[in-house]
């Protein structure tokens, strides 16, 4: 993998490559979370609520979102469920 970086030291180049990979994984996980939330909001159902809640929990456990944001998001979704 070729990463555009100013780093000259081998370990710094490797860290830059790993940072790009981590950013792609994290972005994909957050995007999946947002997609699950939007799917639930478009058609509130118990099944979609569980999927959205699960994706929020996964993002929280990976450190992508703060635990308070996860709780707030799940509470708002639960309120929409009724």
Curated annotation (Swiss-Prot):
Disulphides: none
GO MF terms, alphabetically ordered: small ribosomal subunit rRNA binding; structural constituent of ribosome
InterPro entries in the record: Ribosomal_bS20, Ribosomal_bS20_sf
GO cellular component, one term: cytosol
Keywords: Ribonucleoprotein, Ribosomal protein, RNA-binding, rRNA-binding
Gene Ontology terms describing biological process: translation
Signal sequence region: none
PANTHER family per UniProt: 30S RIBOSOMAL PROTEIN S20, SMALL RIBOSOMAL SUBUNIT PROTEIN BS20C
Similarity annotation: Belongs to the bacterial ribosomal protein bS20 family.
Role according to the record: Binds directly to 16S ribosomal RNA.
Record protein name field: Small ribosomal subunit protein bS20
Species name: Streptococcus pyogenes serotype M4 (strain MGAS10750)
């Amino acid at each position: 993998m070729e990463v555009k970086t100013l780093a000259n030291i081998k370990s710094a180049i490797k860290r830059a490559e790993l940072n790009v990979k981590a950013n792609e994984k994290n972005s994909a996980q957050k995007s999946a979370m947002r997609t699950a939330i939007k799917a639930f909001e478009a058609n509130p159902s118990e099944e979609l609520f569980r999927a959205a809640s699960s994706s929020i929990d996964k993002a929280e456990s990976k450190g992508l979102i703060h635990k308070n944001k996860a709780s707030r998001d799940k509470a708002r979704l639960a309120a929409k469920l009724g």
